[in-house]
Amino acid sequence: MTRFYYLFFLMLSTFSPISIADERFSISAGGMLFGDLYYVSKSHLPDTTESAGWVTRRGVLTANAKAGENWFARARVEAFDEGNAEDYDLTGQGRDLYIGRKLGQHAITGGLIPTISYDVIEHHWNKRYLVRLAPDLHGVPSRDLGISLKGKISNDARVSYRLMYGSSATWEADHNAYDKFIGAVVFQPTEESLLELYVDEEPRPGNHDRSTAQVFAGRKTEQYFMGVLYTHQDRQSDPPLEVAALLGTLKVTSSASLVSQFHYLFEPSPKGNSITYLPFDPSARASNIVAGIEFSLGRQLLITPNVAWTVYDQNSQGVRPEDDLQVRLTVFFNFE
């Protein structure tokens, strides 16, 4: 794995965006890398308390292609550290591999594709390098082998739809071994504001079906972004997921912005200890905030000092788990 580590980052460090184009076909390629210098001040996991080091949360190489005005495709591979603080190990996988075609005001895409759970929200939020969205952290998948259809409902483009089927087949970044049916509608009354309504259904064997309802409302201007996200996932006999999040950015100078995500878990996260980089105690409800100051050092480098702090309610035994507190310096190189 060490050889893979050095090879990947040698490629990324020397990478610059490239493109080849003619009248009928074009291809472009780029990459990005983000990670943290971190110090764990407190943790509900005693072995990680007072640990420190560097973690590579994502290194990505991407190739995009277009043929004519309608066909498009993407191939993307990624490398990332997995494990726990002071015990990380770099691994890699394919993240995207798909082909699509525009059909007037609609588009169909098939392959290993991003789910439609987060695409609109992340486009407006645009801070995934700092922290994943709350439902993504707690188990709603972001990739699936499947097919999606997106398009406009109204002629003025203020109402649009997205439909997707995710198959039970798994490959690379898709780890969900169940069929999934997804739909969403976006209302955009102005260029700056939007409302998204989202649902999905995931049949599973026995009494373990999953169904999700999600609402997002946001507003984005040149000066700030603010958004509210609520997700409820019923898991029948399994513990449910219910989470609310507040997202925000505020530009304070031409090269500095305040950024934050706060979220509250209405129910404990059963697999919280397995969440890489930000583990949660699985026995208690929790409030988490990730907040920092983002400094832009040119078009391709962001430096963001930030804190990630989780506070717990009392669990069913009447015990409040130890807080989780990380101090981080997040670095983001973007060559895409």
Which residues does each PLM region occupy?
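Interfacial loop-to-helix transition and helix-capping segments at the boundaries
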Residues: 175-178, 208-210
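Outer-membrane beta-barrel pore domains
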Residues: 25, 34, 39-50, 85-90, ...
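Hydrophobic helical h-region of N-terminal Sec-dependent signal peptides
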Residues: 6-10
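Conserved adenosyl
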Residues: 172
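Outer membrane beta-barrel
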Residues: 22-40, 50-168, 177-179, 186-195, ...
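Positively charged n-region of N-terminal signal peptides that target proteins for export
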Residues: 1-4
